[in-house]
Regions:
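Short hydrophobic/aromatic-rich beta-strand motifs
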Residues: 71-72, 109-113, 163-190, 218-226, ...
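Short, surface-exposed terminal/edge motifs of secreted or surface/virion proteins that either
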Residues: 81, 117-133, 170-202, 252-257, ...
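Beta-propeller and closely related beta-pinwheel folds
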Residues: 49-59, 150-159, 297-388
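Repeated scaffold domains used in trafficking and secretory/extracellular systems
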Residues: 55-69, 94-108, 135-147, 298-308, ...
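Short loop/turn segments that connect beta-strands within the blades of beta-propeller domains
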Residues: 68, 75-77, 107-108, 114-116, ...
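Short, intrinsically disordered N-terminal pre-domain segments
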Residues: 1-38, 43
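Small/polar beta-strand repeat architecture
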Residues: 4-8, 131, 183-221, 226-300
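Extracellular/surface-exposed low-complexity repeats and stalk/linker segments enriched in Gly/Pro
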Residues: 93-99, 139-171, 175, 201-204, ...
Length: 388
């Protein structure tokens, strides 16, 4: 029997040395897979099957969960934290948040919860607000120019020429315009007997005496001040706005603000309906009517998705179409702009649609939209760059 010659089949073997993961596009290569079920990346770069499903615990009304030295679950309005340490008892905080879906992120020992803007501390099990608000309700607020130590001054006299025989430590207000002796053009001076000369005392700060404010704010916080009669009184034109707290005093705050106006050298006491300015020598007064109470706030933006990258919490707001970053290591300050590397950061994006997620990958903060990916580069606000 004679058989026809058959073409010999060549044997070949192809090795995949790099696993590319999931690729749902049309250009899926041999080192990738377009879809999969029951796979796991725990043995990366090798692809393995997942572990069998098992029941860990039963939860009702779950709105979010996050693991940081333990598992935090948000069930309805309650927070339940189960530490990883053996024998540690779970911590429950009832009525801590509103009932709704949450975005959570961890930094340090704290887990931040949005949109409620609260932080759960895994170290002591406490819940605290990220923002803070102080408002004058039935109490008066005092505004006075002060030095870098928070000290306010009183003078016994003023004029164009200093006294001929001053006492040691005597204060004198040297004026440039006698018709406006309390204006910012005048200079507060103090006499020193040891040197025999007068020294200028700069009053570049404002001491805000407001009972309870010292418990809500901390040093270097950025506080938004509203409702003051400072501009109306002719003391400061920029007291209303974002100010940096340079020091927390016994019963108030010390903020930096440039003195501008014809009545800088005086004290302003403001109540719910009126305000009164008194000169440094106590001899002149002026009264004003006010309609809004004094309000001080440490603001936190409304964020839809959050992630942590390089010791900052990053978040995005679909309402404003803005990406925010908190101050370095401080998730309570989101509007701190002092011109240093630890400043907060914000950038408006030009893409359409709402944000759909946020993540940190390979040291970069990523923000997702349906058809856009925004990527943040850089290590400090001065060199942050956004690519899309």
């Amino acid at each position: 029997m004679v058989l026809a010659n058959r073409a010999k089949l060549q044997n070949s073997r192809s090795l995949v040395r790099v696993f590319g993961g999931l690729n749902e596009t049309y250009a899926c290569s041999e080192a990738e897979y377009s879809a999969g079920v029951n796979f796991s990346a725990r043995d990366f770069p090798a692809l393995s099957t997942r572990k069998p499903r098992r029941k860990l615990r039963e939860l009702t009304g779950l709105n979010g969960m996050y693991h940081l030295n333990g598992l935090l679950t948000v069930c309805g309005k309650d927070l339940i934290y189960t530490p990883d340490a053996d024998g540690a008892n779970p911590v429950t905080c009832t009525e801590a948040v509103t009932d709704g879906k949450k975005a959570l992120v961890g930094i340090g020992t704290k887990i931040l919860i949005f949109p409620d803007k609260v932080a759960f501390d895994t170290a002591d099990g406490s819940v605290s607000a990220l923002g803070a608000v102080w408002q004058a309700e039935g109490q008066s607020v005092q505004f006075a120019p002060c030095d870098a130590a928070g000290k306010a001054y009183e003078v016994s006299g003023y004029g164009k020429e200093e006294p001929e025989k001053p006492a040691d430590g005597q204060l004198f207000l040297k004026v440039e315009d006698e018709e406006h002796p309390w204006a910012s053009t005048s200079t507060l001076e103090e006499y020193s007997a040891s040197s025999g000369s007068w020294t200028a005392v700069p009053l570049e700060y404002c001491r805000i005496t407001a009972a309870g404010a010292q418990k809500l704010f901390a040093q270097w916080d950025t506080v938004t001040v509203q409702g003051t009669a400072a501009q109306q009184a002719g003391m400061w034109t920029k007291l209303d706005g974002d100010l940096v707290v340079y020091d927390v005093l016994e019963n108030g705050l010390r903020v930096r603000v440039s003195p501008e106006g014809d009545h800088v050298y005086g004290t302003l006491v403001q109540s719910a309906e009126s305000a009164q300015w008194t000169s440094l020598d106590g001899k002149e007064t002026r009264s004003f009517a006010v309609s809004t109470p004094v309000r001080m706030e440490r603001r936190v933006p409304d964020l839809d998705y959050v992630t942590e990258c390089d010791n900052r919490v990053w978040g995005c707001s679909s309402k404003e179409n803005v990406i925010y970053a908190c101050r370095l290591g401080d998730p309570t300050n989101w509007f701190s702009y002092r011109g240093i590397a630890a400043d907060s950061y914000a950038v408006t994006v030009g893409s359409d649609g709402a944000f759909t997620g946020a993540a940190t990958c390979m040291g970069y903060a990523l923000f997702f939209k349906e058809n856009t990916l925004h990527k943040l580069y850089g290590s400090k606000p001065s060199d942050f760059q956004l690519t899309s």
